[in-house]
Regions:
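Helix/loop segments that flank and initiate small ligand/metal-binding modules
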Residues: 1-84, 149, 215-217
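Short amphipathic alpha-helical segments and their helix-coil junctions
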Residues: 26-41, 117-134
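Short amphipathic alpha-helical interface patches used for protein-protein assembly/oligomerization
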Residues: 64-66, 101-106, 150-162
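Short Cys/His-based metal-binding microdomains
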Residues: 68-119, 124-125
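Short amphipathic alpha-helical segments embedded in low-complexity Lys/Glu-rich regions
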Residues: 69-71, 93-95, 164-169, 187-194
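Short flanking/linker segments adjacent to small metal-binding domains or redox-active Cys/His motifs
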Residues: 133-161
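Short secondary-structure subsegments characteristic of cysteine-rich extracellular domains
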Residues: 164-181
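C-terminal helix/juxtamembrane-tail motif
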Residues: 190-217
């Protein structure tokens, strides 16, 4: 029996509802957890970014609010000046987050005009199953990479006294997106149609020319 089969068997025999389900219900209501978990498997590149999103989803990321709940004092404010640092503030409401999300939203709405604007639930938990039926996979991964880029800038501020710049965060995000798109281009050499649909967003992010790829961002 494989490790995967053993783990699946144990889950069936002793299923426990993850703590995050109860943690976030008073704030965001009943969420689409199966869809959230599935989005962590869309890309196996940049695993550290996926791990960060997993911590965010479970509410165990060591942001300022969580550190304060452990009794830590003399913590810096957020780089925007607000005291405290909730996950929603850091990744959605903060002016830096809003500026970078503005660029992401333009891409998203260009690819899927009939989908709703990005809300906190999208940023923290990804897309619902219904939305995923219309949204190319690359956008679920872009949200993961977006949070990773914001987190890197946040850590540079708290541990290196380097105030974040929108242009630097955007450059980091674009570089990570290009890397992932190119990796999936090489991985899907025998299924270009799936690549064009899910990873180039039907030509919005990249175009295929024979065996070469032109990334447009």
């Amino acid at each position: 029996m494989t490790v995967k089969a053993s783990y699946a068997f144990l889950l069936e025999q002793s299923f426990v509802v993850p703590h995050c389900v109860w943690k976030w219900r008073p704030v965001y209501g009943d969420l689409y957890w199966d869809a959230t978990w599935s989005q962590f498997t869309f890309s196996n590149f940049l695993r550290t970014a996926v791990d960060l999103s997993w911590k965010i989803t479970h509410g165990v990321l060591h942001n300022l609010d969580r550190l304060a709940s452990f009794g830590y004092t003399n913590l810096k404010n957020c780089y925007c000046g607000q005291s405290g640092e909730s996950l929603e503030h850091l990744f959605y409401s903060c002016p830096l987050a809003q500026s970078v999300l503005g660029w992401v939203s333009v891409l998203f709405l260009s690819a899927v005009p009939d989908c709703p604007s990005l809300r906190p639930r999208h940023v923290l938990f990804g897309f619902s199953s219904e939305e995923l039926s219309r949204v190319p996979k690359v956008f679920a991964v872009i949200l993961i990479l977006y949070k990773w880029s914001i987190w890197l800038a946040r850590n540079d501020y708290h541990f290196g006294d380097r105030r974040p710049c929108v242009d630097d965060v955007l450059a980091s995000l674009k570089a990570h997106i290009c890397f992932v798109v190119r990796c999936h281009f090489r991985k899907s050499w025998n299924d270009r149609r799936a690549f064009v649909k899910h990873w180039s967003a039907n030509g919005l992010l990249a175009s295929v020319h024979g065996d070469s790829l032109l990334v447009k961002i």
